[in-house]
Amino acid sequence: MDRPAVSGPMDLPIMHDSDRYELVKDIGSGNFGVARLMRDKQSNELVAVKYIERGEKIDENVKREIINHRSLRHPNIVRFKEVILTPTHLAIVMEYASGGELFERICNAGRFSEDEARFFFQQLISGVSYCHAMQVCHRDLKLENTLLDGSPAPRLKICDFGYSKSSVLHSQPKSTVGTPAYIAPEVLLKKEYDGKVADVWSCGVTLYVMLVGAYPFEDPEEPKNFRKTIHRILNVQYAIPDYVHISPECRHLISRIFVADPAKRISIPEIRNHEWFLKNLPADLMNDNTMTTQFDESDQPGQSIEEIMQIIAEATVPPAGTQNLNHYLTGSLDIDDDMEEDLESDLDDLDIDSSGEIVYAM
């Protein structure tokens, strides 16, 4: 099970000795920029800082990510702290999840037992349920966007709200975003869709991968065949291998999630009442009110929305005397002429944007 690769040179953020945060190590990079583990010199707390190059990269997705993320305070969501403007980058400071990605944990294990998969799925649904209650749909839920803290029984943390949409602030989603393996059928079609219902599908893909150790709609013989993956998604073609032994209740839940018609797909509230989900449900996940009261006042974002918007506006201006020399991968999938013809003939309703690309994030 592979992740998309990102390569190429990258401008590193300029830091100063007087900065509040000091570098511990680099912890990742992607289409967004670079992420670093930093230490708060005042509190000695470790934080994760995502750096996005100033200028054209500071777009509506970045603004949406920051504003939506700031509004969310839940134990299963990585906590937003603040944004900072450096001479070269916009820095987003957030909680550090020391346990790494759920993706890596599955890769190391091969696949999870049903009980372990349920343990993490319960937390994922708790976090997603809270997001939806706050009128935020994530739209890019996947294993790489679910982190773990460092505790013995790891707490799952949803991160990366770069493609999320708030139904309060934004219109119904219509663009095709998300990692192909996790995209719901309706997101591939040229019509508006309910982002909350699409999130349910992505949660189902995550559950399947935890149980099976492979993506549900990829052909095992041709995992890189993008056209075939999309065809299988639209036709809901998946199977649970014979070597994977799971309960009938679990199979039933998966079958209720992988439903092409969004109106007939199981909802988050229905998942939370499903017998498989309720088994061994931790007490602190039973009531959303108890979850959101676990944060004290010190966890409140210190910056107002107005302050954040001002910083973002300044970040849209490139650093003086510099220009963007590095154009690294955006995470979009190029579709060649032959593939586009095949897609048009097989899948007339596939939504390809004006650039000829289907957008997905990493």
Curated annotation (Swiss-Prot):
Modification Phosphoserine, positions: 7, 18, 29, 43, 175
Annotated segments matching region Domain I: 283-318
Knockout-associated phenotype: Impaired ozone-triggered rapid transient decrease (RTD) in stomatal conductance. Impaired induction of MKKK18 activity after 90 minutes of abscisic acid (ABA) treatment. Delayed CO(2)-mediated and darkness-induced and reduced abscisic acid (ABA)-triggered stomatal closure.
GO molecular function per UniProt: ATP binding; calcium-dependent protein serine/threonine kinase activity; identical protein binding; kinase activity; protein kinase activity; protein phosphatase binding; protein serine kinase activity
Predominant place of localization: nucleus
Enzyme Commission number: 2.7.11.1
CDD domains hit by this protein: STKc_SnRK2-3 (cd14665)
Gene Ontology process terms (BP): abscisic acid-activated signaling pathway; cellular response to absence of light; cellular response to carbon dioxide; defense response to bacterium; leaf development; positive regulation of abscisic acid-activated signaling pathway; protein autophosphorylation; regulation of anion channel activity
Effect of residue 43 to A/D: Normal kinase activity, but constitutive ABA signaling pathway activation
Reported effect, residue 178 to Q: In ost1-4; no stomatal closure when RH decreases, and insensitivity to ABA
Residues reported in the UniProt entry to bind ATP: 27-35, 50
Post-translational modification: Autophosphorylation on residues Ser-7, Ser-18, Ser-29, Ser-43, Ser-175 and/or Thr-176. Only the phosphorylation of Ser-175 is crucial for the kinase activity. The phosphorylation of Ser-43 may repress the ABA signaling pathway in absence of ABA.
Ways its activity is controlled: Kinase activity enhanced by ABA and low humidity. Repressed by PP2CA independently of its phosphatase activity. Probably inactivated by ABI1. Repressed by TOPP1. Negatively regulated by ABI2.
Chemical reaction(s) catalysed: L-seryl-[protein] + ATP = O-phospho-L-seryl-[protein] + ADP + H(+); L-threonyl-[protein] + ATP = O-phospho-L-threonyl-[protein] + ADP + H(+)
InterPro entries the record matches: Kinase-like_dom_sf, Prot_kinase_dom, Protein_kinase_ATP_BS, Ser/Thr_kinase_AS
Induction: In roots by ABA in an ABI1-dependent manner and by osmotic stress (e.g. sorbitol) in an ABI1-independent manner, but in leaves by low humidity (at protein level). Also induced by salt stress.
Keyword Magnesium tagged: no
Annotated stretches, region: Activation loop: 160-186
Similarity comment: Belongs to the protein kinase superfamily. Ser/Thr protein kinase family.
Entry protein name: Serine/threonine-protein kinase SRK2E
Originating organism: Arabidopsis thaliana (Mouse-ear cress)
Gene name, Swiss-Prot/TrEMBL: SRK2E
